[in-house]
Protein backbone atom coordinates (compact mmCIF):
# COMPACT_ATOMS: atom_id res chain seq x y z
CA UNK A 1 0.00 0.00 0.00
CA UNK A 2 1.43 3.36 -1.02
CA UNK A 3 1.20 6.50 1.08
CA UNK A 4 0.43 9.96 -0.16
CA UNK A 5 2.55 12.88 0.89
CA UNK A 6 2.34 16.62 0.45
CA UNK A 7 -0.66 18.91 0.62
CA UNK A 8 -2.62 21.26 -1.59
CA UNK A 9 -4.26 24.59 -0.92
CA UNK A 10 -7.75 23.04 -1.08
CA UNK A 11 -6.94 19.79 0.71
CA UNK A 12 -8.87 20.68 3.86
CA UNK A 13 -12.23 21.42 2.24
CA UNK A 14 -11.87 18.32 0.05
CA UNK A 15 -11.37 16.08 3.08
CA UNK A 16 -14.54 17.52 4.59
CA UNK A 17 -16.54 16.85 1.41
CA UNK A 18 -15.28 13.27 1.22
CA UNK A 19 -16.04 12.58 4.88
CA UNK A 20 -19.48 14.18 4.69
CA UNK A 21 -20.85 12.81 1.41
CA UNK A 22 -19.09 9.51 0.56
CA UNK A 23 -21.86 7.39 2.07
CA UNK A 24 -24.43 9.00 -0.25
CA UNK A 25 -22.64 8.23 -3.52
CA UNK A 26 -24.85 5.76 -5.46
CA UNK A 27 -22.14 4.34 -7.76
CA UNK A 28 -19.36 1.87 -7.07
CA UNK A 29 -15.69 2.84 -6.98
CA UNK A 30 -14.81 1.38 -10.39
CA UNK A 31 -17.84 3.03 -12.00
CA UNK A 32 -16.62 6.40 -10.77
CA UNK A 33 -13.12 5.76 -12.11
CA UNK A 34 -14.32 4.67 -15.55
CA UNK A 35 -16.62 7.69 -15.88
CA UNK A 36 -13.48 9.69 -16.68
CA UNK A 37 -13.72 8.13 -20.16
CA UNK A 38 -17.16 9.73 -20.56
CA UNK A 39 -15.96 13.11 -19.34
CA UNK A 40 -12.94 12.90 -21.68
CA UNK A 41 -15.22 12.24 -24.64
CA UNK A 42 -17.44 15.17 -23.67
CA UNK A 43 -14.44 17.49 -23.60
CA UNK A 44 -13.42 16.44 -27.11
CA UNK A 45 -16.98 16.84 -28.42
CA UNK A 46 -17.28 20.27 -26.80
CA UNK A 47 -14.03 21.45 -28.36
CA UNK A 48 -15.11 20.25 -31.79
CA UNK A 49 -18.55 21.86 -31.59
CA UNK A 50 -17.09 25.09 -30.20
CA UNK A 51 -15.60 25.75 -33.62
CA UNK A 52 -19.10 26.71 -34.74
CA UNK A 53 -20.57 27.91 -31.43
CA UNK A 54 -18.22 28.98 -28.64
CA UNK A 55 -20.94 28.43 -26.03
CA UNK A 56 -20.24 24.69 -26.27
CA UNK A 57 -17.20 25.37 -24.07
CA UNK A 58 -19.55 25.41 -21.10
CA UNK A 59 -19.88 21.67 -21.71
CA UNK A 60 -16.12 21.50 -21.16
CA UNK A 61 -16.51 23.31 -17.84
CA UNK A 62 -19.26 20.88 -16.82
CA UNK A 63 -17.09 17.88 -17.79
CA UNK A 64 -14.19 19.20 -15.69
CA UNK A 65 -16.46 19.61 -12.67
CA UNK A 66 -17.95 16.13 -13.13
CA UNK A 67 -14.51 14.56 -13.53
CA UNK A 68 -13.44 16.30 -10.33
CA UNK A 69 -16.41 14.89 -8.42
CA UNK A 70 -15.98 11.30 -9.61
CA UNK A 71 -12.21 11.43 -9.11
CA UNK A 72 -12.62 12.86 -5.61
CA UNK A 73 -14.93 10.08 -4.46
CA UNK A 74 -13.79 6.95 -6.33
CA UNK A 75 -11.13 5.90 -3.83
CA UNK A 76 -13.16 7.06 -0.84
CA UNK A 77 -16.15 4.95 -1.90
CA UNK A 78 -13.96 1.86 -2.22
CA UNK A 79 -12.50 2.38 1.24
CA UNK A 80 -15.88 3.13 2.82
CA UNK A 81 -17.59 0.05 1.36
CA UNK A 82 -14.46 -2.11 1.44
CA UNK A 83 -14.91 -2.81 -2.28
CA UNK A 84 -11.82 -1.02 -3.52
CA UNK A 85 -9.56 -2.53 -6.18
CA UNK A 86 -6.24 -1.21 -4.94
CA UNK A 87 -3.88 -2.12 -7.78
CA UNK A 88 -6.46 -1.69 -10.55
CA UNK A 89 -7.67 1.54 -9.00
CA UNK A 90 -4.18 2.99 -8.67
CA UNK A 91 -3.33 2.19 -12.29
CA UNK A 92 -6.61 3.17 -13.94
CA UNK A 93 -7.29 6.25 -11.82
CA UNK A 94 -3.98 7.89 -12.63
CA UNK A 95 -3.81 6.71 -16.23
CA UNK A 96 -7.29 8.07 -16.92
CA UNK A 97 -6.29 11.36 -15.31
CA UNK A 98 -3.68 11.62 -18.05
CA UNK A 99 -6.26 10.65 -20.69
CA UNK A 100 -8.52 13.45 -19.47
CA UNK A 101 -5.64 15.94 -19.54
CA UNK A 102 -4.70 14.91 -23.08
CA UNK A 103 -8.32 15.19 -24.27
CA UNK A 104 -8.68 18.61 -22.67
CA UNK A 105 -5.58 19.93 -24.42
CA UNK A 106 -6.55 18.21 -27.68
CA UNK A 107 -9.98 19.86 -27.57
CA UNK A 108 -8.28 23.24 -27.67
CA UNK A 109 -6.49 22.05 -30.79
CA UNK A 110 -9.76 22.56 -32.65
CA UNK A 111 -9.68 26.24 -31.70
CA UNK A 112 -5.98 27.15 -31.69
CA UNK A 113 -3.85 27.25 -34.84
CA UNK A 114 -0.53 26.76 -33.01
CA UNK A 115 -0.62 23.05 -32.23
CA UNK A 116 3.06 23.11 -31.26
CA UNK A 117 2.34 25.09 -28.10
CA UNK A 118 -0.38 22.63 -27.15
CA UNK A 119 1.95 19.70 -27.75
CA UNK A 120 4.51 21.34 -25.47
CA UNK A 121 1.82 21.71 -22.79
CA UNK A 122 1.14 17.97 -22.91
CA UNK A 123 4.87 17.17 -22.79
CA UNK A 124 5.41 19.39 -19.74
CA UNK A 125 2.35 17.98 -17.99
CA UNK A 126 3.62 14.46 -18.69
CA UNK A 127 6.95 15.51 -17.18
CA UNK A 128 5.26 16.18 -13.84
CA UNK A 129 3.51 12.80 -13.96
CA UNK A 130 6.71 10.95 -14.86
CA UNK A 131 8.58 12.66 -12.03
CA UNK A 132 5.79 11.75 -9.60
CA UNK A 133 5.79 8.06 -10.50
CA UNK A 134 9.58 7.76 -10.56
CA UNK A 135 9.69 9.39 -7.14
CA UNK A 136 7.05 6.92 -5.96
CA UNK A 137 9.10 4.01 -7.29
CA UNK A 138 12.11 5.22 -5.33
CA UNK A 139 10.42 6.16 -2.04
CA UNK A 140 6.97 4.47 -1.96
CA UNK A 141 5.56 7.88 -1.06
CA UNK A 142 3.06 9.08 -3.62
CA UNK A 143 2.95 12.85 -3.88
CA UNK A 144 0.56 14.41 -6.38
CA UNK A 145 0.92 17.85 -4.80
CA UNK A 146 3.69 20.13 -5.96
CA UNK A 147 4.30 23.67 -4.65
CA UNK A 148 0.84 23.60 -3.05
CA UNK A 149 -0.85 22.62 -6.31
CA UNK A 150 -2.64 19.34 -6.83
CA UNK A 151 -5.28 17.97 -9.21
CA UNK A 152 -7.99 20.29 -7.87
CA UNK A 153 -5.96 23.44 -8.40
CA UNK A 154 -5.02 22.25 -11.89
CA UNK A 155 -8.69 21.77 -12.72
CA UNK A 156 -9.34 25.34 -11.64
CA UNK A 157 -6.68 26.42 -14.14
CA UNK A 158 -8.45 24.33 -16.81
CA UNK A 159 -11.76 26.02 -16.05
CA UNK A 160 -10.14 29.48 -16.10
CA UNK A 161 -8.52 28.74 -19.47
CA UNK A 162 -11.82 27.51 -20.90
CA UNK A 163 -13.71 30.58 -19.72
CA UNK A 164 -10.93 32.80 -21.09
CA UNK A 165 -11.35 31.26 -24.54
CA UNK A 166 -15.15 31.59 -24.31
CA UNK A 167 -14.88 35.23 -23.21
CA UNK A 168 -11.99 36.57 -25.30
CA UNK A 169 -11.52 33.95 -27.99
CA UNK A 170 -8.67 31.61 -28.77
CA UNK A 171 -6.32 34.37 -29.91
CA UNK A 172 -5.70 35.59 -26.35
CA UNK A 173 -5.05 32.06 -25.14
CA UNK A 174 -2.57 31.59 -27.97
CA UNK A 175 -0.70 34.65 -26.66
CA UNK A 176 -0.79 33.45 -23.04
CA UNK A 177 0.11 29.80 -23.73
CA UNK A 178 3.86 30.30 -24.39
CA UNK A 179 4.24 32.11 -21.07
CA UNK A 180 2.21 29.44 -19.31
CA UNK A 181 4.45 26.74 -20.78
CA UNK A 182 7.54 28.67 -19.67
CA UNK A 183 6.11 28.87 -16.15
CA UNK A 184 5.42 25.13 -16.19
CA UNK A 185 8.94 24.42 -17.44
CA UNK A 186 10.48 26.43 -14.58
CA UNK A 187 8.33 24.57 -12.05
CA UNK A 188 9.22 21.21 -13.59
CA UNK A 189 12.95 21.93 -13.44
CA UNK A 190 12.55 23.07 -9.82
CA UNK A 191 10.63 19.89 -8.98
CA UNK A 192 13.21 17.60 -10.56
CA UNK A 193 16.06 19.43 -8.84
CA UNK A 194 14.33 19.26 -5.45
CA UNK A 195 13.41 15.59 -5.86
CA UNK A 196 16.85 14.42 -6.94
CA UNK A 197 18.42 16.38 -4.09
CA UNK A 198 16.16 14.65 -1.55
CA UNK A 199 16.87 11.22 -3.04
CA UNK A 200 20.61 11.94 -3.04
CA UNK A 201 20.48 12.73 0.69
CA UNK A 202 18.54 9.53 1.36
CA UNK A 203 21.09 7.46 -0.55
CA UNK A 204 23.97 9.08 1.31
CA UNK A 205 22.34 8.34 4.69
CA UNK A 206 21.83 4.69 3.73
CA UNK A 207 25.38 4.04 2.57
Residue ranges and their predicted role:
Residues 1-61, 103-207:
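Hydrophobic alpha-helical transmembrane segments
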Residues 59-106, 131-138, 193-194:
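Acidic (Asp/Glu-rich) catalytic motifs at the cytosolic membrane interface
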Amino acid sequence: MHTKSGRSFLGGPEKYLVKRFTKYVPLETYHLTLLTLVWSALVLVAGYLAQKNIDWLWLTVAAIVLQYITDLFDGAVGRYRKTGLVKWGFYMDHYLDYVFLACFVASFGFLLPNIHMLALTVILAAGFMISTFLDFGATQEFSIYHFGFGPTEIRIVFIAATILVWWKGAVLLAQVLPWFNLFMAVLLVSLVYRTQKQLWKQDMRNR
